């Protein structure tokens, strides 16, 4: 699949969507399977491109992976020791490959491990320095050679203390996994509390780890000898959920999202209400109902529970169709506004200055030929296209397949 052709504008879209399991939860859970000497069974698995790439990575390391797309289930079996080299060809398009560092370290702390630096979306600085600093607090030595991080610990992993300089999702997950078998207790401060990180912690604790919160962003991990009962149902994907809420919003429709915990989208729901959309929710679903009285807003992205940076390109597209001046401040990634020039090709008026965007909303967009550059930009352009007059062609649609199941 090379491109989408979308004919707009779409009339008010109405209906229900059953949300997939969270890709950003599934990937670290798959990496965590390395910690187990027996089977790990994951349910509600989203079989998107990144998940299939991670499957291939685990197989390359020596695991057996059986999947049932119909049942949305994956079984990972570790019958033998893993290979300790994570190759570049399997992480070049997927940053989550870096998460194997923590789990491989925990299983094989005194062995030499080589992990290629990965890819993913080109959103700005996303280095591994905080991951490696966290590992160092456990007694790990590291070096960089020809694009590979080399890590090992002569004396094994010993619990101590570490505080992340800034909240990092993958850094938190990596250090948690590295710490599950430590000698003693490891204390970690300023961790990410994204729903996907909490999902990982719940999975590990249900499998025998001893991870306790000492405060909102502080935990202690008491080392254990082994993990058991690796069975887990993945949480619903909050980014996919918000994507489809935005489909309803930008078409003045009415849409219900199932298989999602509304508390994982508390900031996003608050923003939609401020704009003027009516939101109804219960424990496992969210319904958006459009309104004729919509107004521009100001928002700022940030670590959970703030407005998610992944959802910013989506609301950006919606705001281009709401009359008035809206403002966005992006605090996580330097290149998160990749959708702006493509939306401007459709007639949107988005002005970018450093990490801030000013959106002069208007009622109509026009079709255009656009190029996708990353996962969330893809869906942002799709949102623009379904609201635009005429047929829009979107190239490099493969970026969207990394994170959206059955996008077509």
Regions found by a protein language model. Name each.
Residues 1-408:
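Short, structured segments at the rim of ligand-binding sites
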């Amino acid at each position: 699949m090379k491109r989408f052709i979308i004919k707009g504008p779409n009339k008010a879209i109405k209906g229900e969507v059953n949300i997939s399991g969270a890709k950003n939860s599934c990937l670290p859970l798959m990496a965590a399977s390395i910690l187990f000497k027996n089977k790990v069974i994951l349910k509600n698995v989203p079989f998107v491109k990144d998940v299939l790439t991670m499957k291939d990575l685990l197989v390359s390391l020596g695991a057996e992976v059986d999947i049932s797309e119909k049942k949305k289930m994956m079984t990972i079996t570790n019958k033998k020791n893993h290979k300790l080299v994570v190759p570049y060809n399997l992480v070049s398009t997927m940053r989550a490959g870096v998460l194997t560092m923590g789990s491989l370290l925990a299983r094989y702390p005194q062995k030499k491990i080589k992990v290629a630096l990965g890819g993913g979306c080109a959103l700005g600085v996303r280095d591994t320095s905080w991951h490696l600093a966290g590992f160092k607090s456990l007694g790990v030595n590291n070096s960089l050679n020809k694009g590979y991080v080399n890590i090992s610990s002569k004396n094994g992993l010993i619990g101590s203390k570490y505080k992340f300089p800034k909240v990092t999702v993958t850094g938190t997950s990596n250090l948690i996994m590295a710490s599950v078998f430590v000698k003693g207790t490891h204390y970690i401060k300023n961790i990410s509390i994204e729903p996907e990180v909490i999902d990982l912690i719940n999975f590990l604790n249900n499998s025998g780890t001893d991870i306790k919160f000492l405060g909102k962003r502080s935990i202690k991990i008491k080392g254990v000898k082994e993990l058991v009962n690796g069975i887990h149902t993945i949480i619903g994907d909050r980014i996919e959920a918000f994507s489809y809420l935005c489909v309803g919003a930008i078409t003045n429709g009415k849409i219900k999202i199932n298989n999602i915990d509304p508390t994982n989208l508390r900031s996003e729901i608050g923003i939609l209400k401020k704009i003027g959309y009516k939101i109804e929710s219960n424990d496992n679903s969210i319904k958006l109902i459009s309104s004729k009285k919509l107004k521009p807003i100001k928002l700022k992205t940030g670590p959970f529970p703030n407005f998610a940076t992944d959802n910013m390109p989506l609301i950006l597209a919606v705001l281009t169709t709401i009359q008035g001046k809206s403002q966005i401040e992006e605090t996580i990634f330097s290149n998160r506004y990749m959708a702006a020039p493509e939306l401007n090709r459709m007639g949107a008026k988005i002005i970018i200055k450093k990490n801030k965007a000013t959106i002069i909303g208007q009622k109509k967009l026009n079709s255009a030929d656009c190029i996708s550059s990353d996962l969330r930009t893809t869906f942002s352009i799709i949102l623009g296209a379904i609201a635009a007059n005429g047929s829009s062609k979107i190239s490099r649609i493969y970026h969207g397949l990394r994170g959206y199941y059955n996008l077509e």
